[in-house]
Curated annotation (Swiss-Prot):
Pfam families: zf-C2H2. It comes from the Eukaryota. It comes from Saccharomyces cerevisiae (strain ATCC 204508 / S288c) (Baker's yeast). The gene is ADR1. One of its GO terms (biological process) is regulation of transcription by RNA polymerase II. SMART domains: ZnF_C2H2 (SM00355). A zinc finger (C2H2-type) spans 104-126, 132-155. The keyword Signal does not apply. This is Regulatory protein ADR1. Keywords: Activator, DNA-binding, Metal-binding, Nucleus, Phosphoprotein, Repeat, Transcription, Transcription regulation, Zinc, Zinc-finger.
Amino acid sequence: MANVEKPNDCSGFPVVDLNSCFSNGFNNEKQEIEMETDDSPILLMSSSASRENSNTFSVIQRTPDGKIITTNNNMNSKINKQLDKLPENLRLNGRTPSGKLRSFVCEVCTRAFARQEHLKRHYRSHTNEKPYPCGLCNRCFTRRDLLIRHAQKIHSGNLGETISHTKKVSRTITKARKNSASSVKFQTPTYGTPDNGNFLNRTTANTRRKASPEANVKRKYLKKLTRRASFSAQSASSYALPDQSSLEQHPKDRVKFSTPELVPLDLKNPELDSSFDLNMNLDLNLNLDSNFNIALNRSDSSGSTMNLDYKLPESANNYTYSSGSPTRAYVGANTNSKNASFNDADLLSSSYWIKAYNDHLFSVSESDETSPMNSELNDTKLIVPDFKSTIHHLKDSRSSSWTVAIDNNSNNNKVSDNQPDFVDFQELLDNDTLGNDLLETTAVLKEFELLHDDSVSATATSNEIDLSHLNLSNSPISPHKLIYKNKEGTNDDMLISFGLDHPSNREDDLDKLCNMTRDVQAIFSQYLKGEESKRSLEDFLSTSNRKEKPDSGNYTFYGLDCLTLSKISRALPASTVNNNQPSHSIESKLFNEPMRNMCIKVLRYYEKFSHDSSESVMDSNPNLLSKELLMPAVSELNEYLDLFKNNFLPHFPIIHPSLLDLDLDSLQRYTNEDGYDDAENAQLFDRLSQGTDKEYDYEHYQILSISKIVCLPLFMATFGSLHKFGYKSQTIELYEMSRRILHSFLETKRRCRSTTVNDSYQNIWLMQSLILSFMFALVADYLEKIDSSLMKRQLSALCSTIRSNCLPTISANSEKSINNNNEPLTFGSPLQYIIFESKIRCTLMAYDFCQFLKCFFHIKFDLSIKEKDVETIYIPDNESKWASESIICNGHVVQKQNFYDFRNFYYSFTYGHLHSIPEFLGSSMIYYEYDLRKGTKSHVFLDRIDTKRLERSLDTSSYGNDNMAATNKNIAILIDDTIILKNNLMSMRFIKQIDRSFTEKVRKGQIAKIYDSFLNSVRLNFLKNYSVEVLCEFLVALNFSIRNISSLYVEEESDCSQRMNSPELPRIHLNNQALSVFNLQGYYYCFILIIKFLLDFEATPNFKLLRIFIELRSLANSILLPTLSRLYPQEFSGFPDVVFTQQFINKDNGMLVPGLSANEHHNGASAAVKTKLAKKINVEGLAMFINEILVNSFNDTSFLNMEDPIRNEFSFDNGDRAVTDLPRSAHFLSDTGLEGINFSGLNDSHQTVSTLNLLRYGENHSSKHKNGGKGQGFAEKYQLSLKYVTIAKLFFTNVKENYIHCHMLDKMASDFHTLENHLKGNS
């Protein structure tokens, strides 16, 4: 090779005169020349070998240690790809052509980048992700600027109706791409132990300089990736922007910027944040010596900020609704009011970057099912609800049909004027058996009319199975009479009835329900075994002579296997009623003596056929029949109904409250759904009297008629008894009685299969009873771990019944049945409206159940109610509308308030429009979004930086003048439940990203494994060893968890106003309105996340997160610890500061400290304790603080870094300075100083305005505050993590003792007790 002299340029690379060494004409062949130099060989390579007449070469230098440096900085160049090793200038700490340091490393191929956005864009070459689809042609792009260029060139700047969030999966990949980047299979890196399936992993010391990859989603891959200028905020207005005229319908928030410089000052709110401008180290008595160095890196924004006006188009800002809309109370006629324009600009001064940050989502798809979001949506046009729409076209659909019958007063459709009265049940109950004489039987039937029940048809026997309670298609008059006004103005109305074109086979549904009622016998059996073991132990300890007790006593202690089948009569157990339970007058009147006797009659029927060896239909465990179940008195049953109405219905209003005030006739009309044909009944009576169906037993017919009346009321009383303190055993017995009655109905129905039954109603009472049965089984399961197979079987039976009965009748069929010229749905009576609305609510409730089990317990099953099932149903009406109607009222037409389907209603929020959400629908919409948009970047309500969209859509201001106190209270409870659920799901999203088997471990009671793999800071520490994105996701989940936990205990409302000028301490009580079955399980995970943060912070303190620690300490000291230590003082004996505070509260000034006078004690300890109790957590201020942390970390990935080695021992100030008044309100004051009475650090006049100044001040003045003692860690000084474990354990114990007898709470309290032992063992 020829030697060429290489003058050096400023970059350090030798310069070669290529024109003197090579001639022109490199045609399609790669040219190489190696030149010998004094220091290292140089390789010249053509970088464009496929192009003609190319004189462009790359210079590659080999260093003495064998490393390669090249002048070609193109990551995808063929030259760099053909090298054996990646050039050093493209690796970590290499330099870009502009001289910037490459500090962001790809964990797949080790290539490094100077900007994080470049790394994230590079990851798409491994994942083939193209997150920017064209709304017209579905072509996908890796960057948004490419999408805009495409739209400008191909579609004349038109982005289509919508920028779809779906990402089309490539079906074909070119052969060349298969052999290159597309063949790289990228897997999300796993963190933590290799056997738990986590997505976190141990990282090296430079982890903070790496960005976590996005989810592994298969996308189409561009054929060629080239370097383009970043579409940043500074160039957004001029870079590849199409004509604005073609984009008028698209708001600016749909353009996502690559790396916006987020401004933390936009989050500042002086009113919320003013109390945090004090020295936070004084609150913790913390001294920082001068040798303690802390990383104080602030984000370097280079003076570049983003100044955008976040505005929606005028048409969007003026988006109002007609009078039929539920939002008219919010918008009204004044479109210039504040609420008339729903956009995010009203929330904060700069809202665009909040959306940009929320869209910058780091997530891992957790669904193993095909999400509806992954399906093509182009065939279905998105319909924004027009609130004037009603049913206009009555067309057939695949799943249901509309049949129209003109009411022309014909004899066929006219109900007989001499319609028989309802049955007198008291007389029916006096006849235990019907005579065998045919004439006597006929007389009884005609006298009582058998409840007008169509359970037994007079048609000939058939081998086909026609289940009466599930048949939808044979109704002569529809159960829902929708009045459709004739447009010509005539008086003739049309009765619209629902029917099935293709009725499904109902036999399987009935079998599942019967099997379900058998399964839940295990609850009663497990309870009896526990009671028997308990009584056996008591008997053994009470006497040394093991003598058998007389028959008048309770059970023998030999076990259930030794119980005879004879009835053992015993008295009810003595109740340990809590005297704190408020007494109230009984309001419900549903139960009376005739109904109680009806319950007893069905129970006797159950026992009779269970004991009869020839009758095996009940299939009951004979050992369980040895215990006689005593029906409570009428007054007790009505009291349980009151508890059900006050504690269950406000959270789950699936049953109309007026049902609890019905008489027996009205209840019968409700169970029959107000629809029967008198002529058909007459035909039935004739066939029965003629003996056509000789094999049919009339006693069975009685049981069918009676059991459907009493089943739902008894289930309601059972659930209400859960809230009766001290009645645990009676609750289990009530549930067993309810189960037997339900089982009697189902088995008797199945027994009558040989008789063709013509029951045209969907039996809403049955679905409501099944829901209550399932909920009770969930909360009262006595097994140590939840039986997932039992839950699946029960919920599968419920979902199958609802899918067969409810879904066809409540489907809106939005594509064919709704248009802008329609009128609202109208019902002939309030009862018909309530039944129709109840079916919608039961369906949504079943959907919520399925999502709850899937999210919180990792229980999935094929027959669950899925998103596609609820998308087409009508949404429920507002609670004010629901409560205003009554089952008792009759004779007036009722119009449905909301008549648009679930899917279109949800998607109407995706464009920034906010309008009223029906309160009961809120939870279902949150579950729908959580499951639908899992693993995607687009969210409506579940944003990492909370934009309060959900809260604003659930605003209750319109209900202020209703003069309906009870209704308004229930509305507030439903809204709170929706917000609590949103916070819980935001926490669950992070937990499932960390460990997908986490919820399964909780379900199986494996708290020890959770501690080892998740809570143990030695093995997993988010503040030390993990990427900034993982830490930010953790802080997001922590923020929402703190919101929930801070609302568990509240001050009494009367105290809030009276205590302003009163020295008395506040009175705090359990917030019962925030408690429900769904919420309690979410609180469990919220406590787990808070404890995890405290453990990590105590192990490796990060002082930029010090404020979170202080706020959690304020929450514990001011509310949680004083309340729980008063109830359970022995549990806090290991915390001297808690004992000190509680003794002071109890004895006021009676406790003196040795060596001090009473005056000194009062002036010192009293003031300090009251100051400590007065420090409340500032939830909104803490949320602003965490959001600022997220913004700074987004701009600077090293913002939260800590220097090594991390120090965990500090000198806490315990000096002798006296307490004096501060010139400003001290929200972050010092600890109560339980090491002594003088509380140091409180009177220092130096006050800082940020954590940064706090730390500097602590270092400069550490010599003043040092006590010369041994250093302490945060865990040793405050024991805050251990305190919160104890708080969690006692909270669930307190809820069980004072709110609901739920065995699920025992499991939760037991988990935290186990965790408490782990922490104490490691301390």
